[in-house]
Amino acid sequence: VIYLYVLLMCGVLGLVVVIAGIRARNMHYWLGNYLRRRRAQPQPKTIVYVAVADHYEPYEGTKDRQAAHRRLKRWVDTYPVIAGAHRDSVGRHPCHTFFYPIEEYDPDVLDALADLTRRGFGDVDVHFHHDNDTAESLRASLLGFTRTLRERHGLLQREGATPGEIPYTFVHGNWALDNSRPDGRWCGVDNELRVLVETGCKADFTMPSAPSDTQTSKINSIYFARGQDG
């Protein structure tokens, strides 16, 4: 009886530790969805797409322009050599997407990234860190930046765009897409999804954000998100 009691207590203790670990890494937001998907029957796949959504921040941790430009130079000098050595099934080499932060605007950096884009090695899209923001301010920031990317740097030239439209894709710099952090930090815009759509955003690549508490329960999926104002 004592032996069984000890085993039971060890099992309970182990379960408590596992649950604590799951909650500490915010896995409880998405683990159920993941386990349900694991039970699904595998489907045959013939084509694999690899999407790289790089939160590209040459000024991360520094305000030194020379340091940022040294980081840029490494990409400009080495990425075409590395990517150019590899081809996919249709003969195309890897193309890296630089999601560039609005608040780090540097025309020289973006000119260099635009050159990589013209050579077929890259693309540039929109990335933003903000806090305590408003829908009006966010809208102005997005429209101003996308216009600059196209008119000043020749970027965001997308096939199928309607006249006057500047389509773009987006990553939220602090993962708090649509003001999703429980403490309300690093965004502030409850209707951010609507603002993104109305300013030309065609897809958001913020997720996955685990182990952040901004991670949604829906994982490993391509889907239409639905926001709720307020």
Task: Briefly describe each language-model feature range.
Residues 2-230:
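Catalytic alpha-helical scaffold of carbohydrate-active enzymes acting on polysaccharides/glycoconjugates
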